Amino acid sequence: RYKLSRKLLTLGFRSLNEHNLLETVLPHLRDLRDQVKETACFGVLGDEKGIFIEQAQGHHTFRFVLSPGKPFELHCSAPGKAIMAYLPKTVRDRYLSYMTFTRYNSRTITSREAYLEELEKVGKLGYAMDNEEELSGVICVGAPIFNYTGYPCGAIWISGPKDRLSKEVVKNTVKA
């Protein structure tokens, strides 16, 4: 005799919700990609890190390609910061307890205090940036996606080389 475990049921429902969310997000990903000509991505929170779900490939020869299911760091990525800034404090604290603040280069946020300051800025601005914090030469701009209850259920972001993502492009992306 077999029965579904609670964890498996939870994963199934999470997957169902992500699928419906993906159907809603995909046209916006494509629009964003078409506006800025860079790869536009969508991801959600996993158990301890973010999880990349889907992308609309940029139009340039050099572009970023990610595999669905690939985890991303929360402390040095635009989507991670965008989601974390809007989580309820208790949920945010749980994720913070898992974080190791791995240093990738001199721009990486490496302390809880600095990260919380960054999240406060993100909350005021409404969007997050990864300004070469994980990969030198790469900039990401991301914003949270909220469900019908106002909970940050994911993020949408663009990634590209810093030479192509000028301040003007970033400003236009934020407006989009």
Language model features with spans:
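Short hydrophobic alpha-helical segments used for membrane anchoring or interfacial signaling
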Residues: 42-47, 56
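N-terminal helix-turn-helix
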Residues: 1-18, 22-23
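Extended hydrophobic
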Residues: 110-176
